[in-house]
Amino acid sequence: MPDSRPDTELSNPQSTKPPLDPHLKALENESIHIFREVAAEFERPVMLYSIGKDSSVLLHLARKAFYPGRVPFPLLHVNTGWKFAEMITFRDEIVKKYDLDLIEHINPRGKAENVTPFTHGSALYTDIMKTEGLRQALDAGQFDAAFGGARRDEEASRAKERIYSFRTPDHRWDPRNQRPELWNVYNGQIRKGESVRVFPLSNWTEVDIWRYIQAENIPIVPLYFAEKRPVVERDGMMILAADPRLELLPDEVKREELIRFRTLGCFPLTGAIRSTATTLEDVIAELEIATVSERQGRAIDRDQSGSMEKKKREGYF
């Protein structure tokens, strides 16, 4: 893993690194303010860590918010067992490098029943391994606030979600019953059993994320950069064919393609894109002319119309 400039920046305010663009600096300040507000206001916060680019930026901001101390809350990874191998390797390196407290949770029912995206379909698999698994982990830790890396530009239901997203005791989200947010004033008062999902990156865009990664030299999973990789075409997506658990269907042929991923999740449900972007500059240039959302590469968002809002109402990330 390449060395990361954040270590130098966090420990040396007089670093010679160029100052942030004013737009990125304003976003950074807002996110850091949100982290500190939640840490002061809630008893048991936790940060949802899904290992992708947004989680990497979220972690960097959390480290900045509480420097020179350690991040004062644990990271929670709801593992499904079907993440890209590169993601798990990256996660373990980051946890060790930054001395983080990581909680890993796999839904025991799903594991016992061998729930997979191949045998149960994307909708049921996601409900059991992600939504149910997340609710289990939050209940076990008695967490009253959970940071997430969702952004409003990603998808319609996320566009209308507040920065403080209130959840019922069974973790459900009612978009009709949310509190107004005036400027940077957040109302974190909750009843016993209720909780809040907090989204410090709400006002960031995908391009903002990448420009910040570039400016701060934040480590990310190599899958975001183009490389020749084995793939198969399935359900209108290019699926990475590097895991022996992926069984080829009779009409499928594995082939090498120059690809990268705009979004990372479970490998059987995440589509790659053809790309020649091998550097941060290339990725940013590619995104500046993109006409579709990064979520187009997620099979779980195609289950039905409004599927993301339905999942969020049931307790999804």
From Swiss-Prot:
It catalyses: sulfate + ATP + H(+) = adenosine 5'-phosphosulfate + diphosphate. With CysN forms the ATP sulfurylase (ATPS) that catalyzes the adenylation of sulfate producing adenosine 5'-phosphosulfate (APS) and diphosphate, the first enzymatic step in sulfur assimilation pathway. APS synthesis involves the formation of a high-energy phosphoric-sulfuric acid anhydride bond driven by GTP hydrolysis by CysN coupled to ATP hydrolysis by CysD. Belongs to the PAPS reductase family. CysD subfamily. Residues 1-22, 298-317 are annotated as: Disordered. Transmembrane segments: none annotated. It comes from the Bacteria. Its EC number is 2.7.7.4. Keywords: ATP-binding, Nucleotide-binding, Nucleotidyltransferase, Transferase. This is Sulfate adenylyltransferase subunit 2. GO terms for molecular function: ATP binding; sulfate adenylyltransferase (ATP) activity. The keyword Magnesium does not apply. Pathway: Sulfur metabolism; hydrogen sulfide biosynthesis; sulfite from sulfate: step 1/3. The lineage of its organism: Bacteria, Pseudomonadati, Pseudomonadota, Alphaproteobacteria, Hyphomicrobiales. It is an enzyme of class 2 (transferase). Heterodimer composed of CysD, the smaller subunit, and CysN. GO terms for biological process: hydrogen sulfide biosynthetic process; sulfate assimilation.
